[in-house]
Amino acid sequence: DAEGTKTLLHKLADRGVNYIDTARGYTVSEEYLGYALEGIRDRFIIATKSMARTKEAMAEDIEKSLHNLRTDHIELYQVHNPSMEQLDQVQAAGGALEALQEARATGKIEHIGLTAHSVEVFCPGSGA
């Protein structure tokens, strides 16, 4: 719950933990973390991710993440687990990458990342 998350984050911060990885799709994770980070946000690096593939959907998810996490910036925002076809969509005109680049240009995010469950996404044609 939110109170348990707050207690845990404060204990972790006191022990030197400073990195949080979450995602839009992790049910209430961003909301609980946003509540828990009040007053200690500057002690953490936040990474989150989205399954959005279009510019419009990604821009919406970035705004939702900022709102839920109760912050004005996110250090790392990632495209989460695209297939090869989806990766093409993400990079094409009107794709999610455009929204991420715009968010970085305005200071809403610092870094753009990619997560994958397949080596093929990172090394196309490698046979790995």
Set out the residue ranges of the language-model regions.
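Short alpha-helix boundary/capping motifs
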Residues: I40-D42, T48-K49, D61, G94
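Short beta->alpha linker loops
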Residues: R24-V28, S50-R53, A116-S118
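Acidic active-site catalytic centers that drive phospho-/nucleotidyl reactions
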Residues: D21, K49, E75
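N-terminal binding-site loop/beta-alpha segment at the start of enzyme catalytic domains
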Residues: D1-F44, A59, A105
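Short, basic/glycine-rich phosphate-binding loops at helix/coil junctions
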Residues: R41-I45, Y77-H80
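Structural detector of well-ordered beta-strand residues that form the stable sheet scaffold
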Residues: I20, I45-A47, E110-T115
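Glycine/proline-rich, positively charged
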Residues: E3, H10, D14, K55-A128
